A protein has these predicted regions:
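Intrinsically disordered, low-complexity segments enriched in small/polar residues
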Residues: 48, 66-69, 180
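Terminal accessory/targeting
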Residues: 93-192
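A structural signal for short secondary-structure junctions
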Residues: 42, 64, 79, 125-127, ...
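Active-site-adjacent pocket scaffolds in enzyme catalytic domains
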Residues: 1-7, 13, 62-122
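Metal-dependent polysaccharide deacetylase catalytic core of the NodB/CE4 family, i.e.
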Residues: 1-58, 81-91
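Repeat-unit-sized solenoid/scaffold elements
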Residues: 37-51, 78-80, 155-173
């Protein structure tokens, strides 16, 4: 009876890193998992959660070509301007599974982000990468003041406002090899 309350979506066959893989490997990981979901669970919803939240241009465009909605591993709310090939998802496991944080998560509003640059966050060479965030509207001076970012394991990054609609976020220290995260927040007066 609980099965009616649960959907299981595609997360690949082997949950391996999908960066720099051949088309053959990528298609096998995505399509074989989808066929198994359809065969064993009679579910054929085309949602794909990138393993480890990682993808490159090739993986992104294959997800697009085959009509999937993609999920990264970054936290955030989904809005009308969200990239439906790289949607955010909130973690609800282990230390992130507290009910108080769940209430906060389901009441979170999307930030008015139009896009981010670079689109594909595979970094090589520049160990203090700059992230440009372009907003879908002008932010008030108070919103810009309250806009805050964090970098995994570091002090707060440098924020350089280009204008009221664009900001550059840059780590103060080199990022370690492996996965790192830039996380930005901004309070809202709206109710979530």
């Amino acid at each position: 009876e609980m099965a009616e309350l649960v959907d299981v979506y595609n997360h690949s066959v082997t949950h391996q890193h999908l960066i720099d893989k051949t088309d053959e490997v990528l298609l096998n990981e995505i399509i074989s998992a989808q066929l198994r979901l359809k065969s064993e669970l009679s579910q054929d919803n085309k949602f794909f959660a990138y393993p480890y939240g990682e993808f490159d241009g090739k993986t992104y465009h294959l997800i697009e070509k085959y009509g999937y909605i993609g999920f990264g591993q970054h936290s955030g709310a989904i809005g009308s301007m969200s990239d439906f090939l790289n949607l955010p998802r909130f973690a609800m496991a282990s230390s992130y599974a507290e009910m108080d944080s769940f209430v906060t998560k389901i009441n979170t509003l999307p930030m008015p982000v139009k896009n981010e640059e670079p689109k594909f966050m595979i970094i090589s060479g520049n160990n203090k990468p700059a992230l440009r965030i372009n907003f879908s509207r002008s932010l008030t001076s108070n919103e810009r003041y309250q806009f805050t970012c964090f970098v995994s394991g570091q002090e707060m990054p440098d924020l350089t406002w280009l204008n009221s609609e664009s900001v550059i976020v840059q780590a103060k220290e080199s990022l370690p090899q492996g996965r790192s995260r830039y996380n930005c927040t901004m309070p809202s007066k709206e109710k979530g």
